[in-house]
A protein has these predicted regions:
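TPR-adjacent "capping" and linker segments in tetratricopeptide-repeat scaffold/adaptor proteins
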Residues: 2-19
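Structural register within alpha-helical repeat arrays
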Residues: 16, 23, 56-57
């Protein structure tokens, strides 16, 4: 059904989100950082995989000096998961501010 949804312009399914995540992981392993970041971002925007895509996205941004992408990611994380333990995201936010 995910294929039909994407074919006819419907909303992506949870299957699509997992497929995007797997593709991002493969691109990361190959060293295609831009492609990996784009697909992690798709998964984050999709929302069905919860916290799962945030960590690799943030790690890649930090490792490859893509600091300008992190403020939006942090904002989305805080909005979606306001009750989560945010100690780690606080540290990332502080480091991002220092880098920018």
């Amino acid at each position: 059904m995910g294929f039909l949804n994407s074919l006819f312009g419907g909303a992506p399914t949870k299957y699509d989100a997992q497929k995007y995540f797997d593709y991002a992981e493969k691109q990361k392993a190959k060293g295609n950082i831009v492609e990996a970041l784009n697909y992690y971002a798709k998964v984050i925007n999709h929302g069905d995989l919860g916290v799962k895509p945030f960590v690799p996205y943030i790690e890649l941004c930090m490792e490859h000096d893509e600091w300008e992408k992190l403020p939006a990611c942090i904002k989305v994380y805080r909005k979606r998961f306001p009750k989560e333990n945010s100690g780690w995201i606080d540290k990332i936010e502080k480091e991002t501010i220092e880098q920018l």
